[in-house]
């Protein structure tokens, strides 16, 4: 048994569940402390011997797991001009799985011993992981069924990973989908739209910030792809009152961007072709 102060109960449960999650055989506990056994299923990205798991965001530490024990990695022990330092200092949730003896630990067995051997292991693994991240994201993009899905996939991955400069630089090198350029070079995540066919043709951007009550409206020539949870693309059916539905949607969701493709059928088809999207991928209202 472990006596704790009542005020420390939640901290104790969180720390205990973090320690026990890497145990191959879970101990018998007479209270539910919410241990989620370690797996790759909850990872943003993963490889054979690493993963990035941001499930608990602010509490997700960078760790080396050796012998079923997770040792927190201290970024300040690494070269501050290195990609390793940037990834460890600015990122969270990195789990590196090590074999017994890959790293050294202190005599108390409570933390890593930051000798040259241990630091070299961590540095080499982070360098390898960055290469794998680039390869994986490019594979995810290339495996998409359509160009539009590829564009959204890359942008969504950027949202998950790009807080860390070294990861951001790796992901920014991905510019194509099976040889096709994903975005305009001079507009971040932008797709240049086709010229109008008729006077009523347009793509209109409706956007709302959670900090403002008003909804902004702008006709655009370049569509900027943003993470899927903040973006909806709609084909207008003039018989169904699309604009009132868009305003209601943005008011309910508190924030986001809606792109309304309006006008002639020829223009709508041209926009879909430019985006690389099928009608089934776009909302019709």
Regions of interest found by a model, annotated:
Residues 127-141:
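Flexible helix-coil linker/hinge segments at domain or subdomain boundaries
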Residues 1-4, 11:
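GHKL (Bergerat-fold) ATPase N-terminal catalytic module, capturing the glycine-rich phosphate-binding loop
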Residues 33-35, 141, 262-268:
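Short beta-alpha junction loops
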Residues 202-285:
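Long, charged low-complexity terminal regions
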Residues 115, 120, 136-138, 145:
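Extended, well-ordered alpha-helical scaffold/bundle regions in very large, multi-domain proteins
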Residues 39-41, 140-155:
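Short, highly charged C-terminal tails/helix-capping segments
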Residues 15-19:
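Alpha-helical scaffold elements adjacent to nucleotide-binding pockets in ATP/GTP-utilizing enzyme cores
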Residues 14, 24-131, 154-223, 244-245:
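GHKL/Histidine-kinase-like ATPase module
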